[in-house]
Amino acid sequence: MNDKLRKMARNIKPKISNEVIDNKLVITLSGSVGEPYWFDDKEEDFINEQRVKSLVGDSKQDIIIKLNSPGGDVFEGIATYNYLNELDNHVTIEVTALAASAASIIAMAGDEIVMCMGSQMMIHEASTVTWGNKADHYKTINALETIDSSIVSVYAEKTGIDRDEITDWLSGETWFTAEEAVEKGIANALKERPKPIENKTVTVQVDGEAIANKVIAHFENKYGISASEPKTGLSKIFGGKK
């Protein structure tokens, strides 16, 4: 994870949880990908294969994963991807805000990948820190090249996109908006927003003359009022003299 993504990670509140909603297992994966020793933090705050396994358990239900992560350890990302990819459950990945770096690899495990409004996906080459002599650095370069090739295979397997195009995306650290991710084929759909409730104004037309005529007819029938003798009629109602 590069410095830019580390800064993003500090702004993403960790939340790793599961719940059953409408007979579907909904798993929230919000936080960095890896093990706590990478970041000196709590184990329950990190996305990794073992954590995801514990959340899925022996469930046979369809799974919805709400993913928000700046990435982290590429090997944990690949391990988590492979675990989810091998499940018999139907898995939907919803990118709620960000799926970057190793998290974008996890996203590829979805039978369906859905981008929420305003969300983004980012893919890039693997990175690491190395030290030693030139032979050590060459070994690290070779390792990074093989990791990148493996990453390309994951994206190509899921999307069917040409490997050369994906390699170009990785080398350029490419960011995709939700719409671009769907357009380029690395996601299946945009999440539909609930339709706003339509305000319907009921117009009531009142026929004032008809109401007045009914009132007059009522008093005429009950009190013997004649419209031509209003004073006499009112006297009957209120007990006045005729």
Regions found by a protein language model. Name each.
Residues 1-94, 98-102, 110-242:
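N-terminal organellar transit peptides
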